[in-house]
């Protein structure tokens, strides 16, 4: 157990099984605790509440349990609150339980942790500050510092009058009249529910202390009163201001939406801190609503709020939003790239940490590796116009070496944990790193020979063999070299040895037909059909559309005895076979190129005797349908 004097709730061991290590007899005697924990439904507030109820009952039952039991109970509560830190009622109950188990210091430590994990909770701040004032009255500077922190976090909330009452009470107790006046001067501009009471108290305070103010507070009163009257139409309709695991009521969502549109209206010219306070309050019940987070970030960006604040909001959204919300998370990456120039090191580090976190969530998302490689090149291998060509070449060569080493180490299962790129590569995004290596070698270093070596090397790897980016890059490379031999081979292998999505293959086939007609000539065409009697670079792509496994060689071989197949004889009528007369040496399906080499022979026929065969007795027509002959 950690030392009580330096205790914070984060010191509790984050083990997955809180009941591990407990005495068997204790577990048998407390089946309610075991069942509640083992059957805990993390998505049901009733189940979580029942768990805390059982913990409280256990504390009452044992009074002063041993350290193992205390740790187990603390761990369960910490698991709940780490997952749902906005359950302010659970923090209060946790503080009470800690007081019963350990005493005042740990109880205060829990409250201190609560305002760290839920900094916009008015209730938790009031509880924490009240406990500090009552139990640590001599720590004036520490208490005042916490009041100032709370003022910035919850002081602009519409119902924050209990906090301001406590703050004024504290400074009055210290007889610091200057600070009392400073607080009143701040409050009278804040649209609070009980604004009028504070104006009255301020005037009384000025008269009693014979103090002057530098402005007409009646004018300030009218302005504040107007703002309060305008926002009351929204404040009065808020039914659920707290966080819950259930869905937010539609009426509340619509009311919050109208409220946010009102406070962000430029024509209202409301105080920025007040608008931020409204957003913070809205995001308590609407924690899982991506649109609200996006609206908040958009407003912060428009108002030129510091990048640190915007990053903090993005990171909070990353923490709380369900994992299937990608829009905001990818928007965060774009924001970091936009702001990169303002602080290269800071934003690069945040970018790397964010990509690492996203790849753990979505390991199959190859776009993340693409974004990471762009930032890696921009940060560690950037070029500028004032650099010499030699310096630029050296940097780009170094970049390719880093890529090649990372690829080789991953394939050989020799990952270097010190190289961040190598820790991010997985089976799905390996091809993206390979493609980046190939593109840099081909387009930047202009080394076609090495590029072809990379293609030949990596196309054999099972993790890359069916990669769309890899083969599209290969296709573009061969097109740039107008290498019809390689291209024809590639087109033939599509769907046979190279398996890509049908839509991708169709796009390639369509593009290749156009490319061939544009860049080829009659000599090239004749040589290709003579070299391969079964491959026509103009007709073949058309025949292969939406039929990836089409192979003229296989089809030619199969056509030798095609007339003997049951499918042909049945002609769609299963069980009824006919042998129709037909030409056995038809020229329709022959390669037209062979017709000029020898004269066309006369047609030969098979099954001619079938012309005069006896008509089948159609019992179905005659007897069932009752039709005459």
UniProtKB/Swiss-Prot annotation:
Write down the Pfam families for this protein, in alphabetical order. HAT_PRP39_C, HAT_PRP39_N
What GO cellular component entries does it have?
A: commitment complex; nucleus; spliceosomal complex; U1 snRNP; U2-type prespliceosome
* Residue ranges of HAT repeats: 68-100, 102-134, 138-173, 175-208, 233-265, 270-302, 446-480
Question: Known InterPro entries for this protein?
Answer: HAT, TPR-like_helical_dom_sf
Q: Where is this protein found?
A: Nucleus
Q: Does the keyword Kinase apply?
A: no
Q: Chief location of this protein?
A: nucleus
Keyword Zinc listed = no
Q: What biological process terms from GO does the record include?
A: mRNA 5'-splice site recognition; mRNA splicing, via spliceosome
Q: Tell me the keywords, alphabetical order.
A: mRNA processing, mRNA splicing, Nucleus, Repeat
Other information = Present with 4460 molecules/cell in log phase SD medium.
Q: What is the recorded function of this protein according to its Swiss-Prot or TrEMBL entry? A: Function prior to stable branch point recognition by the U1 snRNP particle to facilitate or stabilize the U1 snRNP/5'-splice site interaction. Has a direct role in the assembly or function of a catalytically active spliceosome.
Similarity field: Belongs to the PRP39 family.
What protein am I looking at?
Answer: Pre-mRNA-processing factor 39
Source organism per entry reads: Saccharomyces cerevisiae (strain ATCC 204508 / S288c) (Baker's yeast)
Write the lineage as a comma-separated list: Eukaryota, Fungi, Dikarya, Ascomycota, Saccharomycotina
Gene coding for it? PRP39
């Amino acid at each position: 157990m950690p030392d009580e004097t330096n205790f914070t709730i984060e010191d509790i061991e984050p083990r997955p099984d809180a009941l591990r290590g407990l005495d068997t007899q204790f577990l048998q005697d407390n089946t309610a605790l075991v069942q509640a924990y083992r059957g805990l439904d993390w998505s049901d507030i009733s189940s979580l509440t029942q768990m805390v109820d059982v913990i409280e009952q256990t504390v009452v039952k044992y009074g002063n349990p041993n350290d193992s039991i205390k740790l187990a109970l603390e761990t369960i509560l910490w698991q709940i609150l780490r997952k749902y830190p906005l359950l302010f009622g659970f923090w209060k109950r946790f503080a009470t339980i800690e007081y019963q188990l350990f005493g005042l210091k740990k109880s205060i430590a829990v409250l201190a942790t609560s305002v760290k994990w839920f900094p916009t909770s008015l209730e938790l701040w009031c509880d924490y500050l009240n406990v500090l004032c009552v139990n640590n009255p001599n720590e004036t500077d520490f208490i005042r510092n916490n009041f100032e922190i709370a003022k910035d976090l919850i002081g602009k909330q519409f119902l924050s009058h209990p906090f301001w009452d406590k703050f004024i009470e504290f400074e009055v107790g210290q007889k610091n009249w200057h600070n009392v006046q400073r607080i009143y001067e701040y409050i009278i501009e804040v649209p609070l529910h009980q604004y009028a009471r504070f104006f009255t108290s301020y005037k009384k305070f000025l008269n009693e202390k014979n103090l002057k103010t530098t402005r007409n507070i009646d004018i300030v009163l009218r302005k504040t009163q107007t703002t309060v009257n305008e926002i009351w139409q929204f404040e009065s309709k808020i039914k659920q201001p707290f966080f819950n695991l259930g869905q937010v009521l539609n009426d509340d969502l619509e009311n919050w939406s109208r409220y946010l549109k009102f406070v962000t209206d430029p024509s209202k010219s409301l105080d920025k801190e007040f608008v931020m306070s409204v957003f913070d309050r809205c995001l308590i019940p609407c924690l899982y609503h991506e649109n609200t987070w996006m609206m908040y970030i958009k407003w912060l960006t428009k108002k030129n709020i510091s990048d640190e604040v915007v990053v903090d909001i993005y990171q909070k959204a990353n923490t709380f939003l369900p994992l299937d919300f990608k829009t905001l998370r990818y928007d965060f990456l774009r924001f970091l790239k936009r702001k990169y120039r303002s602080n290269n090191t800071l934003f690069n580090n945040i970018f790397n940490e964010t990509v690492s976190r996203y790849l753990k969530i979505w390991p199959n998302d190859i776009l993340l590796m693409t974004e990471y490689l762009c930032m890696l090149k921009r940060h560690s291998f950037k070029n500028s116009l004032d650099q010499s060509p030699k310096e630029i070449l050296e940097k780009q060569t170094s970049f390719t070496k880093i890529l090649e080493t990372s690829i080789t180490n991953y394939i050989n299962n020799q990952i270097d944990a010190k190289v961040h790129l190598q820790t991010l590569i997985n089976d799905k995004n390996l091809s993206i790193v390979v493609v980046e290596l190939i593109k840099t070698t081909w387009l930047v270093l202009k080394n076609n020979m090495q590029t072809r070596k990379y293609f030949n090397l990596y196309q054999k790897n099972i993790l890359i063999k069916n990669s769309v980016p890899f083969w599209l890059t290969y296709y573009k490379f061969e097109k740039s070299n107008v290498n019809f031999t390689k291209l024809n081979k590639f087109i033939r292998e599509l769907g046979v040895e190279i398996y890509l999505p049908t839509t991708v293959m169709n796009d390639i086939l369509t593009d290749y037909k156009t490319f061939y007609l544009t860049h080829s000539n009659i000599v090239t065409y004749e040589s290709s059909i003579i070299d391969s009697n079964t491959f026509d670079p103009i007709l073949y792509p058309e025949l292969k559309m939406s039929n990836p496994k089409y192979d003229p060689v296989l089809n030619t071989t199969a056509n030798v005895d095609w007339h003997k197949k049951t499918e042909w004889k049945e002609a769609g009528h299963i069980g009824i076979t006919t042998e129709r007369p037909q030409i056995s040496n038809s020229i329709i399906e022959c390669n037209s190129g062979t017709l000029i080499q020898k004269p066309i022979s006369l047609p030969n026929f098979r099954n001619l005797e079938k012309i005069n065969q006896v008509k089948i007795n159609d019992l179905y027509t005659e007897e069932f349908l009752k039709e005459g002959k």
